Amino acid sequence: MISERRTNYSEKQNRAGCDLVFTVPKSCSIEASRNEEFRVVLERCHKGAVENTLNYIEQNYIQYEQKKEGMKSIVKTDNMICAKIEHTLNRNQEPLIHTHAIIINKTRDAEGQYRAIHHGQIFKNQIFLSQLYKNQLAKELELNSCKIQVVDKARGNFELIGYSREHIEAFSTRHQQIEKETERLIKEYSSRGIELPLAEIKDRATRLTREAKQKADMPKLQEAWAITRAECGIDTIPKQHPKALKETLNPIDKKDHLDRALLEISNKTTAFRKEEYSALALREGLGKGITQDDIEKYFANKLASNTLFETWAKGSIHYASKESLALENSIYKIGRASCRERV
């Protein structure tokens, strides 16, 4: 989701900006290539989901590093400069509606002076931010009567109902190029005893297979896409017919999903960051209308009712449920009693 734009200046100032890429599910781009009514609604929903995510980043993750009397500290602001560039094709000239949101490396401090942005929170919370976008997009599409299905719950991915993996692969040669190059690089690095994170290898594969952009001849592309759709059977899939609907998931249903997510993460760890819970809850609530606004209200209610508590761990604010803290306390007491018996 995130890459970096660099310049040739000094190390401290060399990051020109942070490039966030928001991409609609492939089936949505394919459907938009044959369905003008759906395309108009999809682009509106996509832009809304992108804006929602960028607003969250601006209000929560824009910071700068400050040094006073030899001590460094991170100071939060609430402003950023962001340029959005919208595309409808990938480099292989296949349908792919996506937006590059480039956050310029400048934010104003309380005195109105520009400061270089400290990107730590943005990079740290990539998974959460990606899911934040996907859930908002899914909700907006469903509120326009579009039919979606969760295809990968673990990764929080959805597609339009009716589209199979084969349909999507028919328009995903760029993705296949990157995957093939990634496999080659993994084997090469392994033979040389080099260990790199998978994300870094994929980024290198993307760059190595990136061809120069070509000027799009849309009439010819539409003809080629129509042939591909017919050959792989996409034309037999009923078209989406958007129509505004009222939200159908009631607050009680949402609370049940959020409670289950809290129980699941509490069973894995005593204390967790809000973003860790949010990413899980959003994945669990994908296609059910759950967004970050619901999670924020849920957290506020839990804190107010003393069933969720703030704690400090690993240098940042974490949260723990009442039950987890009680269990940890009982284990601690048992351990203390056992030590006394041995003494």
What are these regions (language model features)?
Residues 1-343:
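Helicase P-loop NTPase motor core of nucleic-acid translocases
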